[in-house]
């Protein structure tokens, strides 16, 4: 039985991996075996960090809301408690945006929260 070298299918598969490894340092963008390992690891990082990104942004929003709340004489938890008691359902992303770009509106929300803390 003659030896089969793989031909076009193998070449296409390897070219696909090398294309994904474009921009990698050293031999990781030219040698198939090393590039394949790095591409697999990169895809794992991408999968993990798509989930991590959501946690990171939530932490950032909470930090920004806390800083703005303290400028208005409240802690983050008391602000959120007051807003919940007042029936104001604004998500953290929008609150953080208000804290950064519209301080007057955030101050109004803070006063409403202060008035609704038990």
Curated annotation (Swiss-Prot):
Alphabetical list of InterPro entries matching this protein: Ribosomal_bL20, RIBOSOMAL_L20_CS, Ribosomal_protein_bL20_C
Cited PROSITE patterns: RIBOSOMAL_L20 (PS00937)
GO cellular component assignments: ribonucleoprotein complex; ribosome
Domain of life: Bacteria
GO biological process, one term: ribosomal large subunit assembly
SUPFAM superfamilies: Ribosomal protein L20
Pfam families from the UniProt entry: Ribosomal_L20
GO molecular function, one term: structural constituent of ribosome
Keyword annotations from UniProtKB, A to Z: Ribonucleoprotein, Ribosomal protein, RNA-binding, rRNA-binding
Family: Belongs to the bacterial ribosomal protein bL20 family.
Function text: Binds directly to 23S ribosomal RNA and is necessary for the in vitro assembly process of the 50S ribosomal subunit. It is not involved in the protein synthesizing functions of that subunit.
Protein name: Large ribosomal subunit protein bL20
Species of provenance: Bacillus anthracis
């Amino acid at each position: 039985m003659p030896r089969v070298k793989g031909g076009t299918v193998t070449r296409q598969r390897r070219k696909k991996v090398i294309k994904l490894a474009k921009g990698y340092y050293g031999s990781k963008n030219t040698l198939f075996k090393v590039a394949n390992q790095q591409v697999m690891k990169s895809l794992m990082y991408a999968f993990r960090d798509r989930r991590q990104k959501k946690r990171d942004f939530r932490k950032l929003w909470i930090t920004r809301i806390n800083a703005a709340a303290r400028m208005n004489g409240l802690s983050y938890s008391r602000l959120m408690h007051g807003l919940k008691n007042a029936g104001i359902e604004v998500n953290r992303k929008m609150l953080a945006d208000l804290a950064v770009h519209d301080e007057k509106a955030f101050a109004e929300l803070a006063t409403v929260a202060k008035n609704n803390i038990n």
